Amino acid sequence: MKKKIIIDTDPAMGTKGGDPEDCFAIMLALNSPEIEVLGITTVQGNVPVERGYSNAKFLVEELNKEIPVHTGKPGTYDEKRNSKRLWLAGREEMEQITPMIVPLENEASAESFIAKTCKNNSGDIELVTIGPLTNVAKALDEDPNLNKHIN
């Protein structure tokens, strides 16, 4: 039986000077015979959330996979602490190597996708978080009992 996962990530692949490790993890998971990736959610971290979505969507399309990608909201969990971190300053201006892909307006948010998918696969799903935990925190806000559905 394949292990069901959601990957929550801040992939900088496709951004000149960005870190590629999240994308390597995504590629390994998407091509593993032991893993079923139910979806990918993006969070602000190494790059702005919109850039992370574009990078993840581009990667999924290049690998010819039918995996949904959902974007989180820009910013951090605590809006009072939503200032740029020093190491992130200037990343918005980084040269984009891959094309920019914009999410559909009616697409579910990352936190809603996480909450719904975990409930629909109660006890059989694992969250693979390789970025800040903003989307997971917001999903727990949406459903405080969500942790009971995650393996």
Task: Walk through the language-model features, giving the residues of each.
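Active-site histidine-anchored catalytic micro-motif
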Residues: 1-39, 43-57, 92, 96-151
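A glycine-rich helix N-cap at a beta->alpha junction
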Residues: 59-73
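Surface-exposed loop and adjacent secondary-structure segments within mature catalytic domains
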Residues: 70-98
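Short, hinge-like loop/turn segments at secondary-structure boundaries
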Residues: 56-59, 86-88
